[in-house]
């Protein structure tokens, strides 16, 4: 996959944040963790992922450009925290107490599990499903899993199994 072109100023801002937070963590934890690799190959509605064994952070270039400073302030420390937790504690719950501690007490960033960015520009085709109380939009991956009989999804509000709304897909 080709690496998308990121404006140099955006990349520099990402790296400045990453280096500042890493230095802060190394001082607080009295460690010398190395700088992780950063790539801009994350796709879809996911803002970023931490690849633990590769010591790499993958960021979504579209969401970075659309939400610049908020993205840098929230997503970069979020993914760095995953790497630091893995290095310090090994395999633990992704957003568990160790991760929350790392975010709040070491990196001094609010521990938010998910971003609130608009994702219309990066969201792929969705399929409408219904329950007894509302409409749900499922990604193509989830829709295909339902079609193959691998899973079924339930509404969090009413608890009913979601049904594909064939009329809206025509």
Swiss-Prot record:
PANTHER family: PROTEIN SPRT (PTHR38773:SF1). It is found in: Cytoplasm. Its cofactor is Zn(2+). One of its GO terms (cellular component) is cytoplasm. The active site is at 79. Zn(2+) binds at residues 78, 82. This is Protein SprT. The keyword Phosphoprotein does not apply. Belongs to the SprT family. Keywords: Cytoplasm, Metal-binding, Zinc. GO terms for biological process: response to stress. Binds 1 zinc ion. Residues 22-163 form the SprT-like domain. GO terms for molecular function: zinc ion binding. SMART domains: SprT. Pfam families: SprT-like (PF10263), Zn_ribbon_SprT (PF17283). Disulfide bonds: none annotated.
């Amino acid at each position: 996959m080709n690496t998308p072109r990121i404006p140099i100023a955006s990349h520099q801002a990402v790296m400045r944040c990453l280096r500042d937070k890493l230095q802060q963590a190394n001082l607080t934890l009295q460690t010398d963790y190395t700088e992780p690799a950063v790539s801009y190959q994350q796709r879809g509605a996911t803002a970023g992922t931490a690849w633990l064994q590769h010591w790499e952070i993958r960021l979504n270039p579209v969401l970075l450009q659309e939400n610049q400073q908020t993205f840098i302030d929230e997503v970069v420390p979020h993914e760095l925290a995953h790497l630091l937790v893995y290095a310090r504690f090994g395999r633990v719950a992704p957003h568990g107490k160790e991760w929350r501690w790392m975010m709040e007490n070491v990196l001094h960033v609010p521990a938010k599990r998910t971003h609130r960015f608009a994702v219309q520009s990066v969201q792929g085709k969705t399929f409408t499903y219904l329950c007894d109380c509302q409409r749900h939009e499922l990604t193509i991956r989830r829709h295909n899993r339902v079609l193959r009989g691998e899973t079924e999804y339930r509404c969090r509000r009413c608890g009913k199994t979601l049904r594909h709304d064939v009329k809206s897909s025509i």
